[in-house]
Amino acid sequence: GIPCAESCVYIPCTITALLGCSCKNKVCYN
């Protein structure tokens, strides 16, 4: 996938989640 410039180590994907990104390996991917 494409990195969404948001991490999800402590909190889940927030802004990028609205763009269809999901958490994988502590990073939000599209």
Swiss-Prot record:
Pfam families: Cyclotide (PF03784). There is a cross-link at residues 1-30 (Cyclopeptide (Gly-Asn)). The keyword Nuclease does not apply. This is a cyclic peptide. It comes from the Eukaryota. GO terms for biological process: defense response. Disulfide bonds join 4-21, 8-23, 13-28. SUPFAM superfamilies: Cyclotides. PROSITE patterns: CYCLOTIDE, CYCLOTIDE_BRACELET. Keywords: Disulfide bond, Knottin, Plant defense. InterPro entries: Cyclotide, Cyclotide_bracelet_CS, Cyclotide_sf. The presence of a 'disulfide through disulfide knot' structurally defines this protein as a knottin. Probably participates in a plant defense mechanism. Belongs to the cyclotide family. Bracelet subfamily. This is Cyclotide hypa-A. It comes from Pombalia parviflora.
